[in-house]
UniProtKB/Swiss-Prot annotation:
InterPro entries hit by this protein: 6-PGluconate_DH-like_C_sf (IPR008927), 6PGD_dom2 (IPR013328), G3P_DH_NAD-dep (IPR006168), G3P_DH_NAD-dep_C (IPR006109), G3P_DH_NAD-dep_N (IPR011128), NAD(P)-bd_dom_sf (IPR036291)
Name of this chain's protein: Glycerol-3-phosphate dehydrogenase [NAD(P)+]
Uppermost EC category: oxidoreductase
Binding residues for sn-glycerol 3-phosphate: K109, G139, K194, D247, S257, R258, N259
Localization per record: Cytoplasm
Function as written in the Swiss-Prot or TrEMBL entry: Catalyzes the reduction of the glycolytic intermediate dihydroxyacetone phosphate (DHAP) to sn-glycerol 3-phosphate (G3P), the key precursor for phospholipid synthesis.
Catalytic machinery residues: K194 (proton acceptor)
GO molecular function, one term: glycerol-3-phosphate dehydrogenase [NAD(P)+] activity
Species the sequence originates in: Streptomyces coelicolor (strain ATCC BAA-471 / A3(2) / M145)
Length: 336
């Protein structure tokens, strides 16, 4: 009888806990790592994560610890589920503890500020491992629905198809259906940019601009995501799949989406400070909109919706003025 797959999940937020639950339900032995002893104790004693997934029962083969070395020991997969802008510092601490040969799995959907690196690039840069040992999980995966064992599909991406298949097997359950892909660039960009477009759609919803505006933003948002991806060498077909359109639709249409909710509050007239105060978890698009725009400018890619989000979120531009400016841009063919 083969030994069970071991997985370490660094991050006890909603998505880290939800994906840890998927891995455990698929038969893995899962250890969650988090900084707060009280939360780790609650996971182990009550079988719930009261801070991020209250009311969701966690599997018996999932446990939590504050000891990073204990979590990382002998892990076949080391899953990274922390805010994207904190990854570099955290991984620098964890790298000496990693099990030999472990596959590093990114759940994060962002682009690093300053370097404009995708998360897999940050992982490779810090941990000094090859791309064949770095995988990405992405798609329309709202954490609370996954944790409630509601049906969902996802993409597991790695340049090495065999590694992608191993991860696929490790997280395949009756309610979670993963597909493999070798286009890591496209899969990561789809996840990072959809957070920005989710903010834009949320702002439009908060302003009461209607469903035509929402449909237009989603579609043109997908177009600028694809332009950026192609400029970076991604397969354009990736953006019509789960990592692109699938994730974008879920983020832009669900009240469970942090980015959509954040944008809605801004569109209703709340300040950035007020919106931050009522948001308990990270809305990745708030910081990633700047790094996505930086990445686009480095490659000469026009991303007007992303530019508009940056202007509203970080430059204090009125949403009303920003929408007027976006709508008054020079006319052009759709396929450009």
């Amino acid at each position: 009888m083969s030994k069970p797959v071991k997985a370490a999940v660094f991050g006890t937020g909603s998505w880290g806990t939800a994906f840890g639950t998927v891995l455990a339900d698929a038969g893995c032995e899962v250890t969650l790592w988090g900084r707060r002893a009280a939360l780790a104790d609650a996971v182990n004693s009550t079988r719930t994560n009261p801070d991020y997934l209250p009311g969701v029962e966690l599997p018996e083969n999932l446990r939590a610890t504050t000891d990073a070395a204990e979590a990382a020991r002998d892990a076949d997969f080391t899953v990274l589920a922390v805010p994207s802008q904190t990854l570099r510092a955290g991984l620098a601490d964890w790298t000496p503890l990693l099990a030999p040969g472990t596959v590093l799995v990114s759940l994060m959907k962002g682009v690093e500020l300053g370097s404009a690196m995708r998360m897999s690039e940050v992982i490779g840069d810090v941990a000094k491992v090859g791309a064949e040992r770095i995988a990405v999980v992405t798609g329309p995966n709202l954490a609370r629905e996954i944790a409630a064992r509601m049906p969902a599909a996802a993409v597991v991406a790695c340049p090495d198809e065999t590694v992608a298949q191993r991860l696929q097997a490790a997280c395949h359950t009756p309610y979670f259906r993963p597909y493999t892909n070798t286009d890591v660039v496209g899969c990561e960009l789809g996840g990072a940019v959809k957070n920005v477009i989710g903010l834009a759609v949320g702002i439009a919803d908060g302003m009461g601009l209607g469903d035509n505006a929402k449909g237009s933003l989603i579609t043109r948002g997908l177009a600028e995501t694809t332009r950026l991806g192609v400029a970076l060498g991604a397969d354009p077909l990736t953006f019509s799949g789960l990592a692109g359109l699938g994730d974008l639709v879920a983020t832009c249409s669900s009240p469970l989406s942090r980015n959509h909710t954040f944008g809605t509050n801004l569109g209703k007239g709340m300040t950035l400070e007020e919106t931050n105060a009522v948001t308990k978890q990270t809305a990745e698009g708030v910081k990633s909109c700047e790094s996505v725009l930086d990445l686009a400018r480095r490659h000469g890619v026009d991303m007007p919706i992303t530019e508009t989000v940056v202007a509203i979120v970080h430059e204090g531009k009125s949403p009303v003025v920003a929408v007027k400016e976006l709508m008054s841009r020079s006319a052009k063919p759709e396929r450009r």
